[in-house]
From Swiss-Prot:
This is Neuraminidase. The keyword Glycoprotein applies. Gene3D superfamilies: 2.120.10.10. Its EC number is 3.2.1.18. The influenza B genome consist of 8 RNA segments. Genetic variation of hemagglutinin and/or neuraminidase genes results in the emergence of new influenza strains. The mechanism of variation can be the result of point mutations or the result of genetic reassortment between segments of two different strains. It is a single-pass type II membrane protein. Intact N-terminus is essential for virion morphogenesis. Possesses two apical sorting signals, one in the ectodomain, which is likely to be a glycan, and the other in the transmembrane domain. The transmembrane domain also plays a role in lipid raft association. Residues 35-466 are virion surface. Glycans are attached at N56, N64, N144, N284. Its main location: virion. Residues 13-35 are annotated as: Involved in apical transport and lipid raft association.
Amino acid sequence: MLPSTIQTLTLFLTSGGVLLSLYVSASLSYLLYSDILLKFSPTKRTAPTMSLECVNVSNAQAVNHSATKEMTFLLPEPEWTYPRLSCQGSTFQKALLISPHRFGETRGNSAPLIIREPFVACGPKECRHFALTHYAAQPGGYYNGTRKDRNKLRHLISVKLGKIPTVENSIFHMAAWSGSACHDGREWTYIGVDGPDSDALIKIKYGEAYTDTYHSYAHNILRTQESACNCIGGDCYLMITDGSASGISKCRFLKIREGRIIKEIFPAGRVEHTEECTCGFASNKTIECACRDNSYTAKRPFVKLNVETDTAEIRLMCTETYLDTPRPDDGSITGPCESNGDKGLGGIKGGFVHQRMASKIGRWYSRTMSKTERMGMELYVKYDGDPWTDSDALAPSGVMVSIKEPGWYSFGFEIKDKKCDVPCIGIEMVHDGGKETWHSAATAIYCLMGSGQLLWDTVTGVDMAL
């Protein structure tokens, strides 16, 4: 059934026993599309009508001049969100830099928080910049030891995109050392994971209410994707994994509705190790994810999740452009698409976002410029085809971060314009102070806009020695 909005305006006019009811209906059409060819499918709905009974004015004996008038507006609930066609454009350009530690000499409530694992998620009215903080600011006496991934102080925080994540600006959503968030069109869903490594717990918050939990199933650092979950028609899909960082770690997907888990999805296929997926809608039927294998290969595990059947399958990307770090030379892995190759130990979360067009689909990816270090970040694109079977190289589309600058985790998200969605990729640029000083990040954002070539890279402008 297509979503529709019915507004009912009830007008009560009481005068000498006269009651009038007026029903007004309005319908909205939503944009739907198939896996490859996206089409408009308008529909109309008509509200039930009621005849109006007229009063014989000649029989009225008196008029009550003190008659009361009451008007009640029954406004519609916000609609669930659905993926739409992408806004027009053929290249990404530098959109925004959030570099909190350029303001590192500021103290008090305006001090920048120590953060890592930033990502962006968008609702119909705003985008929010999320991150995991160590509950410390810079400058300050508590920033030593902030290189550690998991502790009892870490929290999922957010600010409106464009704001600096300072003590004053940030909303603290929940205790968490791994996180995600997404907006279903009506409300935010927040995901936080914390607890001991052997028995971590996923916590779900819907709006302001804490609504559900999910326990560790492999008892080895249950964790989530560190980027936005994905919602369609009120259902939100979240990737989780549990298992060794250097061995087996099998992922699952949780289907969440209004903050409560309604289904678990167990992917088939190549499931040995899948973590830190970056996911988005290829269509209104399919979620696709480019993930990290930290144990066996420098190829990215690629997930296809059918939201109509709630089934998922994982295979390795077949392209000769290997997207993980560290990685071997492009094209050096021989054998079938499922061959792991070498240099598979270790990895990094990768950026991935869809460009949905009426006649084709673009898949945009990011990877570090260095094959061995988390330095630099380049953008790549492939139009149409199947990531599971296409062995061709991806097309380079520009340098977002030079090899002289840090390029750590990256992620994808989409900004909701009035009639279309704007695909974007974000890059975590980490200030790595080691164990003896603060360890935090800036965020660079590139979005689809206009044509031509990607023109300029991003620098953090931060000198940790200052």
